[in-house]
Amino acid sequence: MRVILASPEAKVWSERKHIPLGLGYLAATLRDGGHEPFIYDAAIEDVPVEFYIEEAEQQGKPYELIGITAATPLIGDAWQMAQTAKSYGLTTVLGGPHLTIMPRESLEPRHDYVDYVFKGEAEHTFLELVDTLQAGRPVQLLPGMHMRGRDGEIISDYSSPMIENLDSLPFPAHDLFKIDRYTNLQPLTDGLDRHARSFTILTSRGCPYKCTFCSKPVTGDTWRGRSVDNVVAEWRWLVQDLHASEIGVTDDIWNLKMDRAKELMRRLIAEGLNTVPWTTVHGMKVNHTDLELFQLMKAAGCKRVGFGVENGDPWMLRNVIRKGQTLEQVRDAFKNAKAAGLQTMGFFIFGMPNETEETMEATIQLALELDPDLANFMLAAPFPGTKMYDMIREGGEIFANDWPDYAIHEQRSRFTMNDGIYNSDLVVRKWRDAYRRFYLYRPERVWEKMSKKSFWTEMPSTISNARRFFLGNKDQNGHHGHNGRVNPEEPVTSVKGILDRAL
């Protein structure tokens, strides 16, 4: 069967475009099953999906099914894409983070153009559905699948499948991506072309930690790691066969088991696969690190590590964020990473429930103390499926009109708490203050950045992002909205004079 696998365009500030790795896994699984997948990533396409649907019809080889993935802010775009595909007679299937949290919503009568919904990791079950449709057999309910019955009622299997043996999955179908249209992952090293051949790799799925702000519905709470042999084989393929210029490890927590992480580093070194720079895109868990691990990572080609610091107040970290780490462990991780010669990046969150001016000031002070090469200060967004969302629903109110309001870069999903303490306007002021004090009010940092080639090659996008970041986007009434998050790959590093004009 000819199948389109599609991803709506995430409307973020960042000009960087990264490969949607999940579609690569689905495509490889379908192809191994004898089907013919085509990947449509709206983020890098110049034409709408119907262009390819019509082109295939004209060639006499029409597509029969479309599978669309969507996070919460993009579910509206996914519905629109499904409606378009249905008008051409395609079977429509939805999956991804939002569908895992709210699977039945997309099968309501107003979405009669959606045929099937999957939750959880759907590589195997999606293939089984396509096989069934190809053979003309009646569709039976599969694990994690939701569909309509004969009378139009929604029938559901509420399990959320997790693939135990990740080695059983084929490597992502990178040959189906238009690699030249994607950008490098981060401003990683001087001299790396912006449109370098950048690939991501997933060495594990799942995370056992219970951070209240984190939504991890698809991969779940159970951590499952690929074997070191399997990871090294894919790494070798990326370096030697696909000629990667950089690699990004995108696990939620790839270093959960330090012995495995160290073994992987030793193998990369021993097999000469340490010549391509790489980074930990989603960061590392500080309480699963030591100096030896960072030294091995450096020798294995790693250039930068990120850490989820989140907050500088011990009470907030322990009782609200529930990160499962201490400030002492945070400080040790930064110290050891720097001692190993790695660049560091810190992720900080402003605006969790119970946040006060004092706790936010503690976060700013900690960021200045740790002094990472890059700092990303984020505004908390109460995504459905998170403990934070439940906390606010129980003790406050969320001001969001529709799912697009949950776009983390727009900050339209503001909320208030009934405790009389939380102040969303104060949160935004302190968040902006954090960026000013970290990036603008320390001349030595400005001069350090200006001395690097990457500063000047990134200048156009930095200016554009800075203006949009500090001025915000205008809503339909012409008012400036507050942006909720700077993209991790686009930290504000411009000179003080440029940003002062934007403030």
Kindly give the residue locations of the regions a language model identified.
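Glycine-rich beta-alpha loop elements in corrinoid/cobalamin-binding modules
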Residues: R2, T29-N165, L379, G385
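Glycine- and acidic-residue-enriched helix-capping/strand-helix junction motifs
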Residues: V12-L23
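Glycine-enriched alpha-helix->loop->beta-strand junction motifs that scaffold or abut catalytic
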Residues: D112-V114, K298-R304, D371-D373
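Radical SAM enzyme core and accessory elements
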Residues: R2-L5, E15, R31, E36, ...
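Flexible glycine/acidic-rich beta-alpha junction loops that bind and position SAM and/or redox cofactors
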Residues: V12-W13, L99-P103, R150, Y209, ...
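N-terminal [4Fe-4S]-dependent radical SAM core
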Residues: K11, L142, R148-T200
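Radical SAM [4Fe-4S] cluster-binding motif and immediate context
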Residues: P172-F347, E357, Q365
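Catalytic cores of alpha/beta
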Residues: E105-E108, N354-E369
